[in-house]
Regions:
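Active-site metal-coordination/substrate-binding segment of hydrolases
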Residues: 89
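Juxtamembrane segments of multi-pass membrane glycosylation machinery
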Residues: 110
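Oxyanion-binding/catalytic loops of NTP- or PPi-dependent enzymes
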Residues: 1-86, 96-102, 114, 123, ...
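Hydrophobic alpha-helical hairpins/lids featuring a short glycine-rich hinge
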Residues: 116-118
Length: 638
């Protein structure tokens, strides 16, 4: 089996697998019964110790504040992302802006301690590796697993890919590849080393937190991905939420209550979070039961409290018919995404051989029914191992048995002065891809160039008719000296979604030996420092009170701050000396925009006025002192 494993890092459950003579899905005693192959993607804190998996999930009812679920929905996200703000109330644990970053980052909290989403994902990965090594040991293998192929949603943006890469490193894994989940499922279904049978698959991967659709052509061990689309906020979690909202409405109807959400918000904190935790557990149970039973009961041990503080028991029956009615709009949304991916590809529907269903949510009967109604019934197939297909495909790739062609999942854009939606890398390009572009400085003496990267969500725009531009990160270029307006900077942007995130290099076009200091920031402390530099420059420009020498000095210091900030991270770790240097230079720059500077300018102006108007009235000694003060103030202000 070796030292490499295939991992499906899921929203609700995660799976690890190996490939040797056959594909072997890892089992563990503390995994979810009955087959013990699913590891709950849940992390909890219990008496100061981290727990992962089923034991962590079992803590959700009694201590939901210290149980992290669905971290995959938060990884690589910013606190100010509109969808994050919309979804905050669904999480029982604390989520804030990162204390060491910008609004383009976020943190979760356990036991009063701040964690990055990558830290939580790393704990899940560590657990999977631990289970895999135990599983290997039972077969006589003693390899230390230190490499992995980790799967991600095909529609993940660059920032989410990068965050998954960081999580893998924090788990002690050398990441062989980030593999799109639908492609992994296609490999699991179609891999046959010596076959020359060509099949084109539309993979419908409906999981706990995301919906992905990809078109993949398979022949033998070769797989060509031609298009992909998805919704990163559509999955089993949303089925659960629909059930919870129904329960609230039913309790309100039964008890004659007007606004249940307001009542819940007014409950004592501990009772409120316990109630919400129990509702989540009960909704998930009901969802599973309704796949095989006509109805399910939702009962919580923690009651609701009405306006008078009286206990209102929660006991609601939901029928399969009602459940199907609730989730039908979500399923119809997923069908539209299938048609989107067909539109993005070169394949008409009649040239698609198989519509392959994988993922936990695809096992809900009404989901399968709606897909069979939307597409030719003879094309729709459920994967033989729908819950493990993605991990199996990752294991086959980890064994080095495939050849693949993949494409860019979505447009990569830069916000420019003359083009706020400049596409630097278009969706559908074959990976890896390298693009070149010339940018010109906008002003004489400009030392800094700021690029803002984002990725538009075309699928959501098609479905909701709203722009959903997902911010990826920022890049500041610091020139080595002032240059005239129109100076051309040649920028090279590289993307290989399998192994690396977005990379960017820059040099002066006419002086290629002059490399421009640059670093791509994704919400960390380097971005916060660079953001403050930009703010200080704006303040100085607004004040318009610097001499030409002062402007040059301010620009020079700003450039030094950026250069130091661009070196803060090395191998994704903070370099304390570079951080200190950047912070010191930032303080120096802040002095140019400070209140003390305005006071110094006031005294400089007053002293010069006194020397000019009252020259003959001032004692020579006093005059000399004033002249010295004016000189000192001039030097300080410059």
């Amino acid at each position: 089996m070796g030292n490499i494993v295939g991992i499906d890092l899921g929203t609700t459950n995660s799976v690890a697998a190996f490939k040797l003579a056959h594909t072997d899905v890892v089992t563990a005693e503390d995994n979810t019964p009955p087959d013990r192959k699913l590891t709950r993607s849940v992390v909890a804190l219990d008496q100061g110790k981290i727990k992962v998996g089923n034991s962590a999930y079992n803590q959700l009812q009694n201590d939901p504040e210290n149980v992290i679920i669905s971290i995959k929905r938060l990884i690589g996200r910013g606190f100010n992302d509109p969808v994050i703000q919309e979804q905050l109330s669904r999480f029982g644990y604390k989520i804030t802006k990162s204390t060491q970053g910008t609004d383009n980052s976020l943190s979760v909290w356990l036991g009063g301690k701040e964690y990055q989403p990558e830290d939580i994902a790393a704990e899940i990965l560590k657990k999977l590796v631990q289970n895999a090594q135990t599983h290997q040991a039972k077969t006589g293998q003693k390899s230390i697993i230190n490499q992995a192929v980790v799967t991600i949603p095909a529609y993940f943006n660059d920032k989410q890919r990068y965050a998954t890469q960081i999580a893998s490193g924090k788990a002690g894994l050398s990441l062989r590849e980030l593999l799109p989940e639908p492609t992994a499922a296609a490999i699991s279904y179609s891999y046959s080393a010596n076959s020359d049978d060509v099949k084109t698959l539309l993979v419908y991967d409906f999981g706990g937190g995301t919906l992905d659709c990809s078109i993949v052509t398979a022949v033998g061990n070769q797989f060509i991905e031609s298009a992909k689309a998805g919704d990163l906020w559509l999955g089993g979690d949303d089925f659960d939420h629909s059930i919870i909202e129904f329960v609230k409405q039913e309790v309100a109807r039964q008890e004659g209550l007007n606004n249940l959400d307001q009542l819940i918000a007014k409950m004592p904190h501990y009772q409120r979070v316990r109630l919400l935790g129990e509702l989540k557990i009960e909704a998930e149970k009901a969802k599973i039961q309704l796949s095989s039973q006509p109805s399910a009961e939702i009962i919580t041990s923690t009651p609701l409290l009405d306006e008078l503080g009286m206990a209102v028991p929660i006991q609601v029956t939901i029928t399969r018919q009602k459940f199907e009615q609730l989730i039908t709009p979500l399923i119809e949304r997923s069908v539209k995404i299938c048609y989107d991916v067909i539109k993005y590809s070169d394949y008409p529907l009649d040239q698609i051989d198989v519509i392959l269903l994988v993922g936990g949510s695809s096992q809900v009967p009404i989901v399968q029914q709606k897909i069979r109604e939307a597409f030719p019934i003879n094309q729709v197939l459920v994967h033989p191992n729908p819950m493990y297909a993605v991990a199996e495909g990752a294991a086959i790739v980890a064994a080095g048995l495939t050849e693949k062609v993949t494409t860019v999942s979505r447009d990569y854009c830069i916000e420019l002065v003359n083009d706020p939606r400049f596409i630097i890398i278009p969706q559908g390009e074959i990976l890896p891809v390298k693009k070149f572009h010339n940018f010109k400085t906008e002003a004489d003496g400009q030392r800094l160039i700021h690029f803002k990267f984002f990725s538009p969500d075309l699928v959501r725009k098609d479905l909701d008719n709203t722009d959903r531009d997902e911010r990826i990160g920022d890049m500041w270029l610091a020139l080595d000296q002032p240059y005239p307006r129109g100076t051309e900077v040649l920028v090279t942007v590289e993307l290989d979604e399998q192994n690396n995130s977005l990379q960017m290099m820059a040099a002066l076009k006419n002086k290629p030996e002059v490399k421009v200091s640059c670093s791509f920031s994704r919400g960390g402390i380097n971005e916060e420092i660079s953001r403050q530099v930009e703010q200080r420059i704006k303040e100085l420009n607004a004040a318009a009170n610097l001499t030409e020498t002062g402007v040059q000095n301010a620009n020079e210091i700003a450039g030094e701050v950026i250069k130091s900030a661009n070196q803060i991270y090395h191998n994704d770790k903070i370099q304390s000396d570079r951080l200190e240097a950047a912070q010191n230079k930032l303080k120096e720059l802040e002095n140019f925009a400070s209140e003390e500077r305005d006071i110094a300018q006031f005294y400089q102006t007053m002293f010069e006025f006194v020397l000019e108007v009252c020259d003959s009235l001032i004692h020579p000694t006093q005059k000399q002192r004033l002249q010295t003060l004016v000189q000192d103030l001039n030097q300080a202000l410059e």
